[in-house]
Amino acid sequence: MKIKDAINRVRWKYKEKIDDYVIVIKDKLTETGLKEIPFTDIYTVDNNYLYLKGEDTIIPLHRVLMIRRKSDDALIWKRGD
């Protein structure tokens, strides 16, 4: 499944519990090299980028590594699967 499709699936299928989901991206500015973005921060997604609400932040989809559910640490989508 493409990352765009996985993001949209979570956004629409689990919208009542959307605050339980995060996207993990590569981030060179953090110690771990990873950063979690809550699904509640997502404005929209297209074929190339993830756009966040209320900011001018645009994240290239090639930086997205996984989608994770926080409540049980379940892996919803992972790059390469």
From Swiss-Prot:
Family: Belongs to the UPF0248 family.
Spans traversing the lipid bilayer: none
InterPro entries: MJ1316, UPF0248
Pfam families per record: MJ1316
Protein name, per record: UPF0248 protein SSO2687
